[in-house]
């Protein structure tokens, strides 16, 4: 939303309104002035995605990381991934992490007719090749190649989850023909999502990292890695509060 809203009238999901109730409330905001809708779709069991597909009718599909949330209602991560891909059956384009073996295999099995923009940090033959990711103390420098053009931008994040999200957003911006210089400028000004690895300066040389918005083990692992990086650079003692 931050990357595209300067040029387009956008309607988006409020926070994570991604359920069978949240999605219709999000779509309800659409009006004749809207040029683009950004909606999150989440599932907790088999069969739910078809209902969300009928509501959203997406043309651009972005498949984010497949985590362990609600896994108790699925036999495997592959089953969950295949269920999520039903949302994209009528899309014009599907964007995903081409280095994720689970996602790549499921996309191949799903026989989608959509154009694929699979980004990769390993395979130079992928449509969007990420040639370098360099983490600094408080920002990350990312270089990429798309349609034989090389570019570089910075983001004010260093955690892996934010980097993966940014690469998905990069692919969407490129598909929508956002100029590279605008992408570079807006990436540098991205603001963090509230309560997701939110860093606040506390008292007595204390730094607070608020990740209360996430609740699964994969997110906790990312948050702990982020905590270690921040504390080591500043020489601080670490305390985890669950």
Each predicted region: which residue ranges?
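Acidic-glycine-rich active-site phosphate/pyrophosphate-binding loop
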Residues: 1, 132-152, 195, 199
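Phosphate-binding loop of NTP-binding sites
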Residues: 1-98, 102-113, 176
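A structural micro-motif
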Residues: 8, 92, 114-115, 128, ...
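Residue-level detector of flexible, active-site-proximal loop/helix-junction positions
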Residues: 17, 45, 102, 123, ...
